[in-house]
Amino acid sequence: MSVLSPIRRTAMVLAAASTLGLLASPAHSQETPVKFQLDWRFEGPAALFLAPVAKGHFKAEKLDVTIDAGNGSGGTVTRVASGTYDMGFADLAALMEFHANNPTAPNKPVAVMMVYNNTPAAVLALKKSGIKTPADLNGKKLGAPVFDAGRKAWPIFAKANGIGNVAWTAMDPPLRETMLVRGDIDAITGFSFTSLLNLEARGVKTEDVVVLPYPAHGVKLYGNAIIVGEGFLKKNPEAVKAFLRGFTKGVKDVIADPKAGVALVKARDGIINADLELRRLKLALDASVLTPDARAEGFGAVSGPRLSLMASQVADAFATKERINPDAIWNGSFLPSATDRNIFATAKK
């Protein structure tokens, strides 16, 4: 039986330690999986989330991100709250409503980055209806799905514009614009960039449509934000910061080259009309992302007084069980620096 010399024994221990270190090192660079749900189908604006995946921005942040389509902001909020998804993209009013109506629910999602600084909600009518201003909506028949953001926020719009009684008709989303074209209703509410192009697809010329955007008529609600489940946020704060960094880089890519962004959407859902979705994306950027309010507040951030006003307006309009605490639904501490979030300096193609 041989006895190892102290020098040889030390060398073997060091070699073993080195080998173990090499074997263990991949664990330190392991990617954090993130399941993310959009608010809607894969349409033009989805490029904002598909770009950082395709461009490798999330990978560079050590994240393994999967993006799934949604079927409405309310559903996305609920699925993030249930833990089915870690993060999502949803209308801030829907998040506020969930908080106020489910005060004891565990894992309530929190908004960590504002993407649509101005709500895309709008009233749309055909010019031949004679509707030109909000006042013309008095006594008219309006239509929208019951969960539509514009319909739910209608009391805020009506109060701001002195509109009295209107009659509402509910329908599934695919029938909204069809019923307007048929004359079953006088006007609809919907996201401007969605309904305008849906009307065009049904043979209506853009110049024959009247669009009354909520933000242009006294309703300065925030739109869609990135939300995170409370549990995921507490367990993975650095991953959330990394996600927002990667996402912001992707937004800059899409602003610089919207056509390339839509190509990524087409790769994910081959049945889309790329030209139509390019227009939808550009409309969304102009109406909700690259806005004067977003420039003033900083992309991704919110204004405290404006957020508080919205919380009060939503609580009244939605008749929530409890009042809404804006501090409970918003956490801006995970945002990248203001310099990194300056998307307005991005050159466009």
Task: Please provide the spans of the model-predicted regions.
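Bacterial N-terminal signal peptides that target proteins for export
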Residues: 2-14
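Sec/Tat signal peptide C-region and signal peptidase I cleavage site
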Residues: 23-29
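Short, glycine-/small- and polar/acidic-enriched structural segments
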Residues: 30-182, 186-193, 212-214, 219-220
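Surface-exposed patches in mature extracellular/periplasmic domains of secreted proteins
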Residues: 68, 111, 168, 254-265, ...
